[in-house]
Amino acid sequence: MSLITDIIAREVLDSRGNPTLEAEVITELGGFGRGMVPSGASTGEHEAVELRDGDKSRFGGKGTTKAVANVNDAIAKALVGKFDVTDQRAIDQAMIELDGTENKGNLGANAILAVSIAAARAAADELGVPLFSYLGGANSYVLPTPMMNVINGGAHSANKVDFQEFMIMPVGAPTVKEAIRYGSETFHALKKLLEADGKATSVGDEGGFAPDFADNEEPLKYLIRAIEAAGYKPGKDIAIAVDVASSELYDAETKTYKLRWSTGEEFTTPEFIKYLEDLADRYPIISIEDPIDENEWEDWAAITAELGKKVQLVGDDFFVTNTQYLEKGINMGAANSILIKVNQIGTLTETFEAIEMAKEAGYTAIVSHRSGETEDTTISDLVVATNAGQIKTGSLSRTDRIAKYNQLIRIEELLDTTAKYKGIHSFYNLSAAAREVIENK
């Protein structure tokens, strides 16, 4: 048993230059752990509360000194000298009870999560094992298939593209290291194509390119060209995923979806489902995130009934990593996958519970970054610890994104011959026939 002897928090900056929170946990046997918290650009309305100061004279109101004070005062008093650092569940539960709200609005999910991560890292450090081994044990061996966001739109950029993310997934690679190479080569091939056509190659929050396009289909055409230019076969070697972030397009009063940044077209829900189905039929799209507004549960069930056998339908804003929402979705047959963002729920314990529930229901779980990231690589260890099988952590540029990929390479090397990269088979929520169709598009 090794008690927590000190907890320290400070305000630092994320990848967008906005303040965020970092916490450190120290144990009586010298264990040390540090956790940094990301933040999102488009956030679900049901996410746990990210506590900000609201003082407009400082960081435009985005300061985190209140959350820092909560760690250094209330949380430290509750945990220091009272908890064994290896008792992650008890530590997380104590902070949840101390907060006393359903959405962590008192202490702030950012304050609680930073300590949750730091405690896990301190325990791993004290035991002398990698974080993924500490969190997952001896059965942690699956390296994830990456979702690489190479074209940004929507809230993640200033262009005229409605969909928030256009991603490539190296489903045919033999290892995660090779998958990262596939992605890097395709990313650079895409850059050359954009430059040749006179399009901008500046990047958005997540490291992807953010040029203007005529509509939401043009980026898909560029992805196909880039995959082929890099020497790979679309579908078989590299599939495509999109994040529609449809809550940004939805008008709850008229119950329509409007392509507000591109053509201005409006769709009823059945029309919008048909629009997405048409794109999935014509391109090797294997995954669609948030295709329906986060509050329209019946419509989620409808699109799942229509497309759920052949395309991964991911709930991000829809589920917000919350087991209550996930359980409701499972019972309704809504979605077939959940995006896992640790700061949406606020502790590692609750994150593990969401991943476990998803797997038991046959849903995939995709461990994800946020648009405002840090150099913290916890999600790389988390995805291997849980054998989740898929990770979404940005493009092949910006150190805050590359840090996660580099950590996966290190983990694969540590696991050596026991490591397994499942590629297309990480989509266990799709039928074998559906996977074959995507590979042959």
Swiss-Prot record:
This protein's GO CC annotations: cell surface; extracellular region; phosphopyruvate hydratase complex
UniProt enzyme class: lyase
A Pfam family: Enolase_C
Coiled coil spans: none
MF terms (GO), sorted A to Z: magnesium ion binding; phosphopyruvate hydratase activity
Top-level taxon in the UniProt lineage: Bacteria
Cofactor(s) for this UniProt protein: Mg(2+)
Main location as per UniProt: cytoplasm
Pathway where this protein functions: Carbohydrate degradation; glycolysis; pyruvate from D-glyceraldehyde 3-phosphate: step 4/5
Active site: E206 (proton donor), K341 (proton acceptor)
InterPro entries listed in its UniProt record: Enolase (IPR000941), Enolase-like_C_sf (IPR036849), Enolase-like_N (IPR029017), Enolase_C (IPR020810), Enolase_CS (IPR020809), Enolase_N (IPR020811)
Binding site for Mg(2+): D243, E289, D316
Chain residues that bind (2R)-2-phosphoglycerate: Q164, K341, R370, S371, K392
Entry keywords, A to Z: Cytoplasm, Glycolysis, Lyase, Magnesium, Metal-binding, Secreted
Listed GO biological process terms: glycolytic process
Compartment(s) where it occurs, according to its Swiss-Prot or TrEMBL record: Cytoplasm; Secreted; Cell surface
Alphabetized HAMAP family for the sequence: Enolase (MF_00318)
Function: Catalyzes the reversible conversion of 2-phosphoglycerate (2-PG) into phosphoenolpyruvate (PEP). It is essential for the degradation of carbohydrates via glycolysis.
Full protein name: Enolase
